[in-house]
């Protein structure tokens, strides 16, 4: 936790809040020379979740603009190819559709796939009116909703594979409602449209099964015998921070190392407000199962009585008005962070003497604690997977104008004890960041502080990247590059900026990994890589190829075990010293009360 005894906190200068950037929009041009023409009345409208729109509007503020939408590993492969095939949105083969043939020669030379994509125009059939054409265009817009929290990529439907090249911000602003079509007198609809009723019903049923009703998803309703017109309407509720799901590259990353996809989060992202209430009436607290603790409070497990949901409860004592102010800032920050690699906030309750934050329970424990296990075979590819996820989470934070400012191994947790999904936790020291305003802080854990924090200089998003470099160095070697015998020596080592790659421990580490670290642990913050540059670095790419030839066990496991043992000893020493001081104070007070 950021609030552990190893942290240093001297002063805080709060920045002003800033609006989150807007996401880009993407376009998908139509094939040259192809006129889609009116839809065939026998052909069912394409489900909105399987289509893309070439003119989707830009996202509202607060939408996530970072990563490409996901391609899910769930479901059969054929569904991912339905976007451009000749049988798009139809249950029957394209050969059964009426074709327009000018001459026998052109009819023979035309491929079947081209005939199916040409719109199947027939001179003998009446053309569909403008309103119906607009309805079909609206139906091609992508589904704006994700089925769950960004923390749960495993349950993303396979029907969302076609969104892989479309930024998530484009899919967050509109929903689609199926309403009965009203035909104008000048638009005679063929009576044979009713024959496509069964096909349309099956198409709707298939989409309904794969994308259950959620706010912002495509809604199917109306009498199918009269046809359906899809209209784009504003989303019922816009979330701050668009959900992110696994991209194809990241999904491939998990398939390399894990037997199963990452598990889902227990609840969707939500906007939390601090409210007064009785904790014991809603939650069963388990103080015996402690997860952590520090200066500001303790963390334990709990269970929501109404749902049986297991959560982590962070209990903060209200000793001064500033304590509540800090908690409100933490809630505000976490409301922005809708990402699979960032812990999710569930509820916040205030009592007369304390504030309790209920958060997602992460059962895997600290990342470092897991990889030092003797049964765990840590390779450089494992390290790449962990580092890339951390950089993904940092990138989302920075796009939402949030700085963590206390990134360290204790704040990187594994979702479970078998997979490779990790999450960043503890936003108690996080700050809103405006690049146009100066922000200075002088708190954090000395071992992972950047030189600008130690010097109380202006900080930026590159401040978190220094800490990312130190964590990566430790994952690869098991050594802490600036750790001294005490905090003063550690801070002096940070200010000097002198560090090196130990020849023995980095013997099995690739040059790409060393280059990655060398571009993060840089004294001049302007020369450091940002999170986006980290994700584009060669070391964090082409993992499938590297996994085939990189299975050598890193030496960092043994050294990390020694590091963790030393850290535990230091924590126990501080705890015992504090208890002894308290005992002496209590004894002195008792003697004074007796007049001794």
Curated annotation (Swiss-Prot):
Phosphothreonine PTM sites in chain numbering: 445
Regions of compositional bias (Basic and acidic residues) in chain numbering: 40-63, 189-209
Keyword annotations from UniProtKB, A to Z: Acetylation, ATP-binding, Calmodulin-binding, Cardiomyopathy, Cytoplasm, Disease variant, Kinase, Nucleotide-binding, Phosphoprotein, Serine/threonine-protein kinase, Transferase
Active-site positions on this chain: 406 (proton acceptor)
CDD domains, A to Z: STKc_MLCK2
Protein residues bound to ATP: 291-299, 314
Disorder this protein is connected to according to its UniProt record: Cardiomyopathy, familial hypertrophic: A hereditary heart disorder characterized by ventricular hypertrophy, which is usually asymmetric and often involves the interventricular septum. The symptoms include dyspnea, syncope, collapse, palpitations, and chest pain. They can be readily provoked by exercise. The disorder has inter- and intrafamilial variability ranging from benign to malignant forms with high risk of cardiac failure and sudden cardiac death.
Region (Disordered): 1-224
Subcellular location(s) per record: Cytoplasm
PANTHER family: SERINE/THREONINE-PROTEIN KINASE
N-acetylalanine, modified sites: 2
Gene name for this UniProt entry: MYLK2
Residue(s) carrying Phosphoserine: 143, 149, 151
UniProt xrefs under SMART domains: S_TKc
Assembly behavior: May interact with centrin.
GO (cellular component) term, any one: synapse
Pfam families to which the protein is assigned, alphabetical: Pkinase (PF00069)
Enzyme Commission designation: 2.7.11.18
Function, as annotated: Implicated in the level of global muscle contraction and cardiac function. Phosphorylates a specific serine in the N-terminus of a myosin light chain.
Catalytically driven reaction(s): L-seryl-[myosin light chain] + ATP = O-phospho-L-seryl-[myosin light chain] + ADP + H(+); L-threonyl-[myosin light chain] + ATP = O-phospho-L-threonyl-[myosin light chain] + ADP + H(+)
Protein name as annotated: Myosin light chain kinase 2, skeletal/cardiac muscle
Organism: Homo sapiens
Transmembrane segments: none
Classification via PROSITE patterns: PROTEIN_KINASE_ATP, PROTEIN_KINASE_DOM, PROTEIN_KINASE_ST
Domain Protein kinase: 285-540
Tissue: Heart and skeletal muscles. Increased expression in the apical tissue compared to the interventricular septal tissue.
């Amino acid at each position: 936790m950021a609030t552990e005894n190893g942290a240093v906190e001297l002063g805080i200068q709060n920045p002003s809040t800033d609006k989150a950037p807007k996401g880009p929009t993407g376009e998908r041009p139509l094939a040259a020379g192809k006129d889609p023409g009116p839809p065939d009345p026998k052909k069912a409208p394409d489900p909105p979740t399987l289509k893309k729109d070439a003119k989707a509007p830009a996202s509202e503020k607060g939408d996530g603009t970072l990563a490409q939408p996901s391609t899910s590993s769930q479901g059969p492969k054929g569904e991912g190819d339905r976007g451009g095939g000749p049988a798009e949105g139809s249950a029957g083969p394209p050969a059964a559709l009426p074709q327009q043939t000018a001459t026998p020669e052109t009819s023979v030379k035309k491929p079947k796939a081209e005939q199916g994509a040409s719109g199947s125009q027939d001179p003998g059939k009446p053309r569909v009116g403008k309103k119906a054409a607009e309805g079909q265009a609206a139906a091609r817009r992508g589904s704006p909703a994700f089925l769950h929290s960004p923390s749960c990529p495993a349950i993303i439907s396979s029907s969302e594979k076609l969104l892989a090249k479309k930024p998530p911000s484009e899919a967050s602003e509109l929903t689609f409602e199926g309403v009965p079509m009203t035909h104008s007198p000048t638009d005679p609809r063929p009576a044979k449209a009713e024959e496509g009723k069964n096909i349309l019903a099956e198409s709707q049923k298939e989409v309904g099964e794969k994308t259950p009703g959620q706010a912002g998803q495509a809604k199917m309703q109306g009498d199918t015998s009269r046809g359906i017109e899809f209209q784009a309407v504003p989303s019922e509720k816009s979330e701050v921070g668009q959900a992110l799901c696994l991209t194809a590259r990241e999904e491939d990353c998990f398939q390399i190392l894990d037997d199963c996809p990452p598990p889902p989060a227990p609840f969707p992202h939500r906007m939390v407000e601090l409210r007064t209430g009785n904790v014991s009436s809603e939650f069963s607290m388990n103080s015996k199962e402690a997860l952590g603790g520090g200066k500001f409070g303790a963390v334990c497990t709990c269970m929501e009585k109404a749902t049986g949901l297991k959560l982590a409860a962070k209990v903060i004592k209200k000793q001064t008005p500033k304590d509540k102010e800090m908690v409100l800032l933490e809630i505000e920050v976490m409301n922005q962070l809708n990402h699979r690699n960032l812990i999710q906030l569930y509820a916040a309750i205030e009592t007369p003497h304390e504030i309790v934050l209920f958060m997602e329970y992460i059962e895997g424990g600290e990342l470092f604690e897991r990889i030092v296990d003797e049964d765990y075979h840590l390779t450089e590819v494992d390290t790449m997977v962990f580092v890339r996820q951390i950089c993904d989470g940092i990138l989302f934070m920075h796009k939402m104008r949030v700085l963590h400012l206390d990134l360290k191994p204790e704040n990187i947790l594994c979702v479970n004890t078998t997979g490779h999904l990790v999450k960043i936790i503890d936003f108690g020291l996080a700050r809103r960041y405006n690049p146009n305003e100066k922000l200075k802080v002088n708190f954090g854990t000395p071992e992972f502080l950047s030189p600008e924090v130690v010097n109380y200089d202006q900080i930026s998003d590159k401040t978190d990247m220094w800490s990312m470099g130190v964590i990566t160095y430790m994952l690869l070697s098991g050594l802490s590059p600036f750790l001294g015998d005490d905090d003063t020596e550690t801070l002096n080592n940070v200010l000097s900026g002198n560090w090196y790659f130990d020849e023995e421990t980095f013997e099995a580490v690739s040059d790409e990994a060393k280059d990655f670290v060398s571009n993060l642990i840089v004294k001049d913050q302007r020369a450091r890589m940002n999170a986006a540059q980290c994700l584009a670095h060669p070391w964090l790419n082409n993992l499938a190829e590297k996994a085939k030839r990189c299975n050598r066990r890193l030496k960092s496991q043994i050294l990390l075990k020694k590091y963790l043992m030393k850290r535990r000893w230091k924590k126990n020493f501080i705890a015992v010293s504090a208890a002894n001081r308290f005992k002496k104070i209590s004894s002195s007070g008792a003697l004074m009360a007796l007049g001794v």
